Amino acid sequence: MSGAYRGRGFGRGRFQNWKRGRGGGNFSGRWRDRTDLSKAAGNHASEQASQPLLQQSTLDQFIPYKGWKLYFSEVYSNNSPLTEKIQAFEKFFTRHIDLYDKDEIERKGSILVDFKELTKDNEITNLIPDIENALRDAPEKTLACMGLAIHQVLTKDLERHAAELQAQEGLCNGGGTMVNVPHIYARVYNYEPLTHLKNIRATCYGKYISIRGTVVRVSNIKPLCTKMAFQCAACGEIQSFPLPDGKYNLPTKCPVPACRGRSFTPLRSSPLTVTMDWQLIKIQELMSDAQREAGRIPRTIECELVHDLVDSCVPGDTVTVTGIVKVSNSEEGSRSKNDKCMFLLYIEANSVSNSKGQKAQTAEDGCKHGTLMEFSLKDLYAIQEIQAEENLLKLIVNSLCPVIFGHELVKAGLMLALFGGSQKYADDKNRIPIRGDPHVLIVGDPGLGKSQMLQAACNVAPRGVYVCGNTATSSGLTVTLSKDSSSGDFALEAGALVLGDQGICGIDEFDKMGNQHQALLEAMEQQSISLAKAGVVCSLPARTSIIAAANPVGGHYNKARTVSENLKMGSALLSRFDLVFILLDTPNEQHDHLLSEHVIAIRAGKQRAVSSATVSRVLSQDSNTSVLEVVSEKPLSERLKVAPGEKTDPIPHQLLRKYIGYARQYVHPRLSTEAAQALQDFYLELRKQSQRVGSSPITTRQLESLIRLTEARARLELREEATKEDAEDIIEIMKHSMLGTYSDEFGNLDFERSQHGSGMSNRSTAKRFISALNSIAERTYNNIFQFHQLRQIAKELNIQVADFENFIGSLNDQGYLLKKGPKIYQLQTM
């Protein structure tokens, strides 16, 4: 080991902060023995009472642990039970010292100890048979024993290597080498079992527990004083007084026996005053199926982070916090100071494990996993059994929301959003990350089950957040900057998109959000949320798939208008959705009969109705739209339907959630050459057709959507390669989406109808009207028109529109006309 240290420059670079010198700048001055240290401290000793220091130095010579006073306040005793624990931990760390990075220990001032390794070590369990109970019931003493043990191991290791270096350089070593190792904290992780927040009661006070939750609030980092220097007003004696938990307190007496001073002045700039970094975070519980309670808001608890733990998480992260339960005085209430007896529980964190920061789970090309889940052996067997199903896509799609009849392709789109594609270059600083999360929008008439499918998708997701658009605010979706009542500082509180990081965010009533749409633009494409409020400028991750449901304006979807006109929504937001499904309530005798059977069977409490099928809308297609004709013998929509008389056994949501979490965590598909070629051919054909009619609604966003969804289709079956069949399935789903988006009221595909353009089936009407206005404005030198003038001009041109006000409003939205006042418009094309 010494050779390795010398090879890496141990003597001159490594641990150089731990070698304290009082003399000159040469090497011998940096390595002083104890006699030199006492001489160097002579001036300070003259100010102190000499007799107590002499007794203390005499006692220190008999303590085998040089850092004893850093960890324990009591006097050292060979017969103390603490000594046995320290010796056992010292042997453990000596055996495993090669596994630890000493540079990192020096930089952080702490060492990570795996609790599972401790309990599996035979020697530790023999020497300390009740180590689990000792850590749980007396955590401070046990952690101090671990810290002193690693302190002693590193001190001996450094002294040995320093002696070797001195011998190599021919320096004399008079009275032994003095190595000053600072306080090292033992951080225990992988502690089990996890404690639910609802079980943290008064009985947990002083216990060592582990919790898991989502960070919803992070405070600023502040200095916390642990030791304060006080000067006696009578004799001028300076003493260092400990402040437990950072609570300010005054000494009761002067350390000089002859002095009776009771007045002390704090010396904040004294070298005897010790401060440390301190941060407060708020953890919100993660709700599983067994823990969901109706009508109760999620519980939260505050955690204190100190030293190297500060700045280890941001709002939205899923963290596992291990620490000691403590109490603090409640600052609330109008009672007097002496009457307060209310206490609040909080956790003094010992270790923080951030799911986002586990780099070992990152794939080689920069693909990033979702929130880490734990899988038992039973879960893995169930996942293996699900994957072995013959028609897996059909089973999973029909397990999403069995209560809703039909809409198989819409459910398939939602399931693809749950699985998601692979995010590329997530950790590469030199490249822009490519998002892998698809976004899905469902638009349709009321009463078709959009909200139920949305809630089912959020329930199945390993991490899902469901919000309603008409009650959500812009800050509630993104980030809230709140002011702390006690300190007056601003703190970040995560909104729905940040809490849904690496998961799903379902937004219902998407059309009733008002101006909150603008908050989604950055989150949907850049996968982050930037904040600039009250002097705070920061960016938080929001890598979430957004699935939204919306009702059209007027209550019924008008096919004569585009999606943008039906929703009164901007084109920038609509173009970010990978799939836009249009659900129409069209009367159909066969479909209505099957649907009524299904609803009656569910109401009667029976199993799923035996007859389950849907009848797709048959749209007339002209010869120019051959690319959207289904060429396979049995299309995906037919393969996903449950045949009459066929019995299905849906996967329970709890198990389906585990399956999705496993796929997102461990499966990272790649496109095969055949799949890439199929997607490219489909995209180029779409571009060719859209250019042929003089418009270009097809962009590279559609190609990226195809790639994302194809990767999700392969991930659904736990495959590492996306095949041509996957690409064909995605092309069919995309066709189904486009049939609703680009078809007009006659069922014909019109590529001039972009999602955000005019909804007229014949745009020449608008062009003819604007051309007439141009000629009138040039002739009269006036480009201002009253509404009744516009109506008269349209009547003269014999322009027949169903709603003239909407027609003018459409021209206003597209920038041809500018509304200058009530019923007054200005022509913009002159």
From Swiss-Prot:
It catalyses: ATP + H2O = ADP + phosphate + H(+). Component of the MCM8-MCM9 complex, a complex involved in the repair of double-stranded DNA breaks (DBSs) and DNA interstrand cross-links (ICLs) by homologous recombination (HR). Required for DNA resection by the MRE11-RAD50-NBN/NBS1 (MRN) complex by recruiting the MRN complex to the repair site and by promoting the complex nuclease activity. Probably by regulating the localization of the MNR complex, indirectly regulates the recruitment of downstream effector RAD51 to DNA damage sites including DBSs and ICLs. The MCM8-MCM9 complex is dispensable for DNA replication and S phase progression. Signal peptide: none annotated. GO terms for biological process: DNA damage response; double-strand break repair via homologous recombination; female gamete generation; male gamete generation; protein localization to chromatin; protein stabilization; recombinational interstrand cross-link repair. The keyword DNA repair applies. It holds the Pfam family MCM. Residues 392-599 form the MCM domain. The modification Phosphoserine is found at S620. PANTHER family: DNA HELICASE MCM8, DNA REPLICATION LICENSING FACTOR MCM FAMILY MEMBER. Its EC number is 3.6.4.12. Belongs to the MCM family. This is DNA helicase MCM8. It is found in: Nucleus; Chromosome. Component of the MCM8-MCM9 complex, which forms a hexamer composed of MCM8 and MCM9. Interacts with the DNA mismatch repair (MMR) complex composed at least of MSH2, MSH3, MSH6, PMS1 and MLH1. Interacts with RAD51; the interaction recruits RAD51 to DNA damage sites. Interacts with the MRN complex composed of MRE11, RAD50 and NBN/NBS1. Interacts with CDC6 and ORC2. Interacts with HROB; the interaction recruits the MCM8-MCM9 complex to DNA damage sites. One of its GO terms (molecular function) is helicase activity. Its main location: nucleus. InterPro entries: AAA+_ATPase, MCM, MCM8/REC_WHD, MCM_dom, MCM_lid, MCM_OB, NA-bd_OB-fold, P-loop_NTPase. The gene is Mcm8.
